[in-house]
């Protein structure tokens, strides 16, 4: 059986091999590890999300990542980056379709990472 530290190292290595930066914050009192995954989207947005691992259960991390991925709505995320006229704001691409394409790319990035981390459980 793998130790929690070994699992953490494997997750970090897997994510980094897939182009992600990872911070892992251990909460000993709650017996959890919170992973924060970040990567730039094709349009340059610093995209990130967090997922939690319970104890040394890689399956709990995969489950939390699946929940995030399944709940990710590229349209809603794109809307957050649009101004009142439907143009990108805060460094987002100017055209609405480009903002949406960037959020769809982010969704694909999460999917690819999820598949890679899921592969660690095999």
Question: Which residues fall in each region the model found?
Answer:
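Intrinsically disordered, low-complexity regulatory regions enriched in serine/threonine/proline
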Residues: 32, 46-122
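Negatively charged, low-complexity tracts enriched in Asp/Glu with abundant Ser/Thr
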Residues: 1-43, 119-122
